[in-house]
Amino acid sequence: MLATQQSKSSNTFEKANELLASDKVLSEQERKDRLKAKRIRIARLRQHEAKFQEEAQWVFKHFTQHFSAVLAQSEKQLESAYRIRHEVFCEETRIFEGNDTKLESDAYDEYAEQCLIQHDKSGDYAGCVRLIMPEADNETLPIEKQGVQYIDRKDLLPCNFPRNEIAEVSRILIPKVFRQRKIDKAACAANTGINIELYDENDIRCFPFIAVGLYMACTAMFKNRGKKHIYFMADPRLGKSMQVVGLTMTQIGDEFEYVGRRVPYYIDFENFLENLKPSFKFMLDEMIKTIK
């Protein structure tokens, strides 16, 4: 039996040597090609990043000339936010069941504020976000009910901080028409009621950055409300996109299932502001003026 094992070990060793030898030959032959391919990939990534940064700089400078952050205070404005939520969650993705009012809301809205991004020329709303800001002990965050068991960083649990210092970002949504790069004007008018003729090339150029506008609207709100500890159960892709554009967040747990795939994030607000890029600060300063 020992001999058999030794024989097997010997054969395995010989095969390993053959593979190593083969790999050396292959790597020698392919080394230059692989190195060239790697350099091409790096060059393309750098080119893409440079193009993105160039586009971002333009948008950050001009975004607030075309779009404004609006704190929903009137019944009409609140309904506009709830309507976007119904459109995306109930009609488009069908995550929630729709209703006859075409408005989506829940119990958290009782101690939350809604913010909208509005296109100045047309008055259309291009996105919404909900900011849940509890004050009383019986007012909880969604992450405390749905995601707390997935949080590994126990030192960053919401219960460790005063209730009036915590908040959660949720329902950050953009209507489908504003998520498109190419727009069929006739179909847009027929299906959404939005007159895309009122949008010039610069307006449409800002569309991919509406999400950033919503992030900055949140930031302006939290700054004005004195919030220090922010939580966010984000779609993994959304979380990554926020970090790609330079918005710093700390992942505090594993991905889990809640209204789709979600990742729990924590934002130390003071640290977030300190690390904010100059281009973001420009947009933030403009929004702080309009959101009180």
Residue map of PLM features:
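Conserved N-terminal entry element of GNAT/NAT acetyltransferase domains
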Residues: S27-E75
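Short acidic (Asp/Glu) patches
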Residues: E97-L103, D109-Q114, P142-L157
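Secondary-structure boundary elements
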Residues: Q77, E91, H119-S122, A220-H229
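Intrinsically disordered, low-structural-confidence terminal and linker regions
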Residues: M1-S27
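Conserved beta-strand in the GNAT
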Residues: L116, G123-M133
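Acyl-donor binding region in acyl/amide transferases
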Residues: A136-M249, G253-Y266
